[in-house]
Amino acid sequence: MPFRRFPLVLATTAVIASVSACAVSASTGSASTGSAGTGSAGQGQDPPVSSASAPPAAASASAITLVVPPGEGGGALSTPRTLTMPAGWTARVWARLPDARMEAWTPEGDLLVSEPNDGRIMELRPDATGTATVTTVLSGLTSPQGMAFARLNGGWVLYVAETDQIDRYPWGSGGIGGARTVIAARLPDQDPSGDDVHRMKDVTVAADGTVYFNVGSSSNANPDDRTMSPQRAVIMAVRPDGTDLRVVERGVRNGEGLAVAPNGSVWTAVNERDNIPYPTHAPYSTYSDAYGQVIRAYVNNHPPDEVAQVTAGRDLGWPYCDPDQDDSHPAGSLANVPLVPNSATNPGGTAMNCAKLAPVEVGLPAHSAPLGMTFLEGSKVPGRWSGGAVVAVHGSWDRQQPQAPAVSWLAWDSAKGTMTPSVTLVGGFENADGTFWGRPVDAVPGPDGALYVSDDAAGAIYRLVPAG
């Protein structure tokens, strides 16, 4: 069966009792945002700078007080905080971790959280107080981030994505059951200049046991990444025993979110480029011909970040082709977004024919910086929410005004095997002055039907309980 980042109740798994995590700035890639629906190319418009481009809020959104138990305050949580969520939901600080990144539930029902800055994997076990007891499971790793549990040869294994390799650990009796096996080694985590842009990695496991992971670009928009050895800006796959290591999808600038859909397909959430030049010969803002110009009003809203299916041989086009929600498309639509030539790296389509590339299934507002992604089917999250995926949006740096951090929700269309544009499920992580007090990194459903959200800015794990 496909991998899930929430517990699977199998005959071999104990019954799970009901229970009441940018510190790593290099990992965010694109971290700016904007309105994906304004500034149609070629119309000479100069869109207003605002946050109106954020996905619409979920129906009946309400301001919900974030409950901070005694001893769990401090830092960003010294001030009372309010989250925007569907009416009837509740929110509580479940644990404090200074560098909380990706999450994965153990077969026994405990939550693993990665702390890349400290090289650790932490285990959070529910306690009687409604919070969690925190212990160290692994340490001394190289910036570990993504994690995935899967069945192998009749037992459980834990995959961990370090920046330079993918590890497999046997899991037994509620913990690491033996020595690690490196199944993909010497992965690129620095560019030739020694920079560490987009070095963080995620990992997921398909139904057939194939292990998928991302290798981000070393730059914002340097074509050399496509010819480096090993390649950058790709999604790779490997068998559990470390054989058949291969590139599956190219042109993926920073596909740091990976997840398996209900139909078994693999999907990635991608941080797209910053400072995009205007793509067409047309008036825009104060320019009579804006082609190739880097214009703040345009950059604010372009290009959209991507949620795309991982398909063998597919190319998302980076850095030659950019998703453009305005080109030959209903302005502002973020479904089936076409790819168009970048005026700096691919003028006139001389380096790559973007029209031959499949459109991006779903766009997110520009510079959202999506990170962890999880499909909720099969979880205990109630109602309509189980019929979609959640994506943790880390928020922007390259936009006036910044795109706010959030947890977005995308409905899964089972008939078409795709997703629909996002709505904001959880918001409210920004201060009145537009700065961020919190930045979600991951969101996973727990065995109790709650949603557990990691936040590496506030250093916390939130337990969000849906109504009903």
Sequence positions of predicted segments:
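Beta-propeller domain segments
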Residues: 54-84, 218-220, 238-241, 253, ...
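Bacterial signal peptide processing site
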Residues: 23-25
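Asp-box/WD-like beta-propeller blade repeats and closely related beta-sheet repeat scaffolds
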Residues: 143, 164-206, 217-220
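Residue position within the beta-strands of beta-propeller blades
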Residues: 112-114, 160, 211-215, 267-270, ...
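Blade-level signature of beta-propeller repeat domains, shared across WD40, Kelch, NHL, RCC1
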Residues: 444-468
